[in-house]
């Protein structure tokens, strides 16, 4: 694992969280129970405090950072998709930030909201609960439906379960030289399917 103390501040990681060995946590970082942090995520707490509350996930290649005297927070069950950047912002409880989105300083994403993939949320934006935000710059398109929130929650549950599965079985290995006969397929833990347009 890549954990670094910075000016006496050491990352805090709950024993029931999972942090991929290639992720980097520096300084003032606090990770709660059941959190999943994916490969190559960078949490650079060398200025502001970075907080991932219980059940949140920060997927592959995500970046968290913020200015001094600010907290960048992903609240409980927050879901941060691959490649997203969070800088000095607050992500509400049970909200989703889509892949490769950018959330800027002082922005607040309301609880149970969804930020569509590739969106850019400007500094200082203050959202309400259950908003669907789309575009660059992101604009409120409509309210999040019950169906969309259910889909989001299934995906978040998958990552909470993945944290447990990774703690139990993920290990470094050497590749095989050929595909074995009857190679099994991995399965998730919920009935979630990719969202269609």
UniProtKB/Swiss-Prot annotation:
One of its GO terms (molecular function) is transferase activity. The keyword Transferase applies. It comes from the Bacteria. Gene3D superfamilies: Hexapeptide repeat proteins. Overproduction of CaiE stimulates the activity of CaiB and CaiD. GO terms for biological process: carnitine metabolic process. The lineage of its organism: Bacteria, Pseudomonadati, Pseudomonadota, Gammaproteobacteria, Enterobacterales. This is Carnitine operon protein CaiE. InterPro entries: CaiE, Hexapep, Transf_Hexapept/Carb_Anhydrase, Trimer_LpxA-like_sf. Pfam families: Hexapep. Pathway: Amine and polyamine metabolism; carnitine metabolism. It comes from Citrobacter koseri (strain ATCC BAA-895 / CDC 4225-83 / SGSC4696). The keyword Repeat applies.
